[in-house]
C-alpha cells in the first residue's frame, strides 16, 4: 500500500532555481543574520529540561511526582502550539516570539526567586507555554526572511547554528550548578533571554 501511495506522488520540479552551494553568509541579509545571532544567543541559555526536573527534585518534589511535571509542560506545549501559531498569523511572528521569550524569562526568574511547590509548578506551566510559542513561530519567521531559492539550505543552516549553541548550553548549566549553585544556570539563561528580547526589537518582519 505504501508503494502505491508513493508511486502516485509526483514531486514538482523546480524551475530556474540555482542550487545552493553550501552555507554562506553572503546569501543572507543583515536582518536574517541578526535573527540567527539572537537565536544562537538564546540557545546558549536554553539548557535541557532535565535540569528543570532535577531542580524540582531539589526543591522537595518526590521522585514519583517529577514525571507529572514533565507531563504537565509537554501537554501544555502540545495544547497551545496551534493557538500560538494561529495568533502569529494574525498579529505577526515577532510579537508571539517576544511572548515566547517572555514566558521563559518569567519561568527562569520564578525558579530563582521561588522554590516552593507552587512556584515550581507555575514555572513548568510557563515553560510549556514558552515551548508552545517558540517552536512553530521561530522556524516560520526564518523561512519568511530567506530568499525562496535558498530556503531549505538556510533553514538547515539555522538549525545547525542553534544546535551547535545548544550543545554547550547544558554543559555550562551543569558547571554553574556544581560550582556556583542551583540558581546560577537560571541567572545566565534569564540574562541571555533578556538580551535576545532586546535584539528581537531590531528584527524586521517581511510583510
Question: Regions from the language model: what does each represent?
Answer:
Residues 7-38:
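Juxtamembrane intracellular "pre-TM" segments in multi-pass secondary transporters
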Residues 95-110, 187-190:
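Structural signature of the two symmetry-related core transmembrane helices
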Residues 112-123:
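Helix-loop junctions at membrane interfaces in 12-TM secondary transporters
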Residues 133-146:
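Intracellular juxtamembrane helix-capping segments at the cytosolic ends
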Residues 175-192:
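A membrane-interface helix-boundary motif in multi-pass transporters
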